[in-house]
């Protein structure tokens, strides 16, 4: 399980804060998952740049993540938004190569405000915790979980290798965005009149 800590007396109780995320996490079979490994990435970008990249609705997946793009059916990519979370989901493809690292029928990506992500591929989960370090740096902690008894170590290692490759691709784009934000040419744009 997970431990959530709040240092404020005025915050809502955890079930109220999680809202429908609780049901979504339970539906993904978290009770059967077992921790396997942790990887930590230090990124030279603001933590919100990483979160924004995660929440773009899969827009960058077919362009930037060829391996992941083969594993999921991007044409059916959908997003749902709640008060303190966003869920992105799509069906997995039947690509033989992707079966070496991802299995199942659905990919579910759940973001919990402000800095926690849950990435489910049926019997596989990786969590991402984004930790601000400074204005232009963050740390991202990846924890990998697999359903007990379902996968051998070779499959787990291949799955983590694919995740590491995806992270390297995301890091490249996040660093480019951060560089653009620091450019003299950058001007803050308008907020969305419809959403903000």
Protein language model regions, located:
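C-terminal catalytic domain of Rieske-type non-heme iron oxygenases
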Residues: 2-196
């Amino acid at each position: 399980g997970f431990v959530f800590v709040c240092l404020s007396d005025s915050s809502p109780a955890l079930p109220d804060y999680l809202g429908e995320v609780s049901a979504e996490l339970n539906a993904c079979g978290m009770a059967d998952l077992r921790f396997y490994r942790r990887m930590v990435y230090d990124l030279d970008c603001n933590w919100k740049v990483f979160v924004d990249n995660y929440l773009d609705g899969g827009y960058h997946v077919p362009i930037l993540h060829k391996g992941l793009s083969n594993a999921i059916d991007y044409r059916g990519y959908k997003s749902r938004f709640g008060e303190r979370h966003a869920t992105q989901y799509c069906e997995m493809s039947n690509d033989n190569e992707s079966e070496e690292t991802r299995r199942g029928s659905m990919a579910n990506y759940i973001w919990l405000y402000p800095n926690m992500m849950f990435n489910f591929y049926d019997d596989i989960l990786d969590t991402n915790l984004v930790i601000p370090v400074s204005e232009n740096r963050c740390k991202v902690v990846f924890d990998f979980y697999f359903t007990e008894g379902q996968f051998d170590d070779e499959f787990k290692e291949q799955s983590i290798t694919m995740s590491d490759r995806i992270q390297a691709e995301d890091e490249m784009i996040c660093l480019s965005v951060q560089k653009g934000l620091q450019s003299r040419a950058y001007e803050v744009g308008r907020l969305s009149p419809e959403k903000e």
